[in-house]
Amino acid sequence: MKLQKNYKFWFCTGSQDLYGDECLAHVAAHSKEIVAALNASGVLPYEVVWKPTLITNELIRKTFNEANIDEECAGVITWMHTFSPAKSWILGLQELRKPLLHLHTQYNVEIPYDTIDMDFMNENQAAHGDREYGHIVTRMRIPRKVVVGHWSEKDVQEKIAAWQRTAIGIIESSHIRVMRVADNMRNVAVTEGDKVEAQLKFGWEVDAYPVNEIAESVAAVSESDTNELVDEYYDKYEILLEGRDPAEFKRHVAVQAQIELGFERFLEEKNYQAIVTHFGDLGALKQLPGLAIQRLMEKGYGFGAEGDWKVAAMVRLMKLMTAGMKDAKGTSMLEDYTYNLVPGKEGILEAHMLEICPSIADG
């Protein structure tokens, strides 16, 4: 399952036409230079795309609506190179539906005291323009990230990178579909929730299927496909038999292989990115899906136990947000089980039967 998609972020620079063609040409050139530097930094996980300078109400509105309908656009970065009258931004900002970052920066690092003139003052007004823009987005109470500092600084780039991952979470949240095998585990409270509200607020779609309908998909997996996956298991994992009969053990492993293939095919066919099971309703399944769930999570699927669709959606979302992230430690469903209350060594042992994602394993 593909985790890191080809999302892009639009870089939109604000100005106005009264500065003249020469000044606006410099504004565009500087913006392109900033975009090129951000992309070449190696810090940002996603590409930044330069857009023509926004100087009118109509152009701002048109650009933001194009961002709304562009499926590759995951967010908009705005910066005011010169002064840009903020009333020109109102309609566009009202209609923007993509995540927004306000980059409060400027082209130059320092004031050129020895050479500064009116041309420089006319062209470089980020401190003035970004305050005007910041005023209107605050007045409109528009959620956004504000990053302050010079665009060449690594800490600024890292803040933009972190926002990009958050923006991906916002965009991808509306594409998450959770498949529940059966329903909530009987009498369990914490795994319940308001699925309608979740779809309204987050975009999550949660559907339940009879366990035996999914079991039919498992039963349809051929013996040859199952054996091929079992061979993959035996190549990948260290098998500890500990006195077990090897042939019998392998038959049990084959059940998990068949479940993995059956579940994955069902998920792909129905276009779900997360799955929920619970051990109180296994129907025709021969075993609790354990190793099968481990491997589905490793491939990028979300998972929640005992009917917990919220955890399943969040596991999927966190996997998407951290995809390709250096030093990412992995994402898994876990439950708090028991405490260690020794003073100075307090901790919680977390687990959940067999359904732990290998991405968090040490080794």
Language model regions located:
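Short beta-strand segments enriched in small/hydrophobic residues
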Residues: 3-26, 175-184
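Structural motif
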Residues: 52-66, 156
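Short catalytic helix/loop segments, enriched in acidic residues and glycine
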Residues: 25-41
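Short, well-structured alpha-helical segments in soluble
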Residues: 60-73, 90-92, 260-269
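Cap/lid and interdomain-hinge subdomains that line or gate substrate/regulatory clefts
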Residues: 45-47, 104, 109-244, 248
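Flexible loop/turn segments at secondary-structure boundaries
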Residues: 18-20, 57-58, 84-87, 109-110, ...
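Anaerobic metallocofactor- and corrinoid-dependent redox/one-carbon enzyme cores
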Residues: 81-82, 98, 104, 111-127, ...
